[in-house]
Amino acid sequence: MDIKPKKYKPTKEEYIKSFKDMLLLRRFEEKCGQLYGMGEIGGFCHLYIGQEAVISAVDTVKQKGDSTITSYRDHAHIILAGTEPKYVLAELMGRATGCSKGKGGSMHLFDIPNKFYGGHGIVGAQVPIGTGLAFAEKYNGTNNICFTFLGDGAVNQGQVYEAFNMAALWGLPVVYIIENNEYSMGTSVARSTFMRDLYKKGESFGIKGFQLDGMDFEEMYNGAKQAAEYVRENSFPLILEVKTYRYRGHSMSDPAKYRSKEEVEQYKERDPLVIIRKTILDNKYATEADLKEIEQSVKEIVKEAVKFSENSPLPDEGELYTEVYC
């Protein structure tokens, strides 16, 4: 499939909403990093800082009824799926009011009413499940699709290719989105896979794919909209590789010494928030005062999330024995 450049362009309203969404994700993740350092968040914590344009664009082109599933770097995905940030932060802080009742933590966020199916701690494990979600949509005769996110490290997992094969064989409406942030934990793409154009990983199954600049919201929007259109119309999978970058380590416990400060700064020069902000101002979609007002509202949302979470109770001990399956 060939992506047509600039076939679709975000509207003024979509630009403004996405700027607010991306800023909220950035400030939320920054606060999570701060709270983790203070010992308020335990366990693993994988931040999405730097990658905000990817999920924001996908969320903008999603239709009501579409589902989302991803890996353990999932805070941003569940928030844009419709979960209030305060319930996400409460979960990270292990509170009973969290979206997973304080039992899932950072890596296992769920919101079934908003069709967000995790949050999965096993690398690549969400891909067969996302394929199954797409099967359910086809079986039930809907026109919904499933956006299944995975990282560059997950593309080397065997179960991913089993899922690709099944999706192609049965013609399932799933968009596989590879968030290629260059490093699988500390291992670069160049050191982990021979085929570095990850969007070509499905070619042997007849699955088309293409690559996008994940730091550019407008390019992401155009590509994601065409990808969703293709999958919805053809009831057939497609692979979307987005080149992006995480500014922080793999997790909060990772000092990221496998890459240079110069490399990180080079990517920060193309910060997705800076790009979308400049586009909005250049096109006179909003003024500096308008954007500052948005920034203040985002600050209040994060502040309220912290207050809500701190004042929420810990789960009752009896919760240890609920929702346990074997």
Swiss-Prot record:
InterPro entries, per database record: DH_E1 (IPR001017), PDH_E1_Alpha_Subunit (IPR050642), Pyrv_DH_E1_asu_subgrp-y (IPR017597), THDP-binding (IPR029061)
One of the GO biological process terms: pyruvate decarboxylation to acetyl-CoA
Needed co-factor(s): thiamine diphosphate
Listed EC numbers: 1.2.4.1
Catalyzed reaction equations: N(6)-[(R)-lipoyl]-L-lysyl-[protein] + pyruvate + H(+) = N(6)-[(R)-S(8)-acetyldihydrolipoyl]-L-lysyl-[protein] + CO2
Record bears the keyword Cell cycle: no
Role this protein plays: The pyruvate dehydrogenase complex catalyzes the overall conversion of pyruvate to acetyl-CoA and CO(2). It contains multiple copies of three enzymatic components: pyruvate dehydrogenase (E1), dihydrolipoamide acetyltransferase (E2) and lipoamide dehydrogenase (E3).
Self-association and partners: Heterodimer of an alpha and a beta chain.
Name listed for the protein in its UniProt record: Pyruvate dehydrogenase E1 component subunit alpha
Organism per entry: Rickettsia felis (strain ATCC VR-1525 / URRWXCal2)
Lineage: Bacteria, Pseudomonadati, Pseudomonadota, Alphaproteobacteria, Rickettsiales
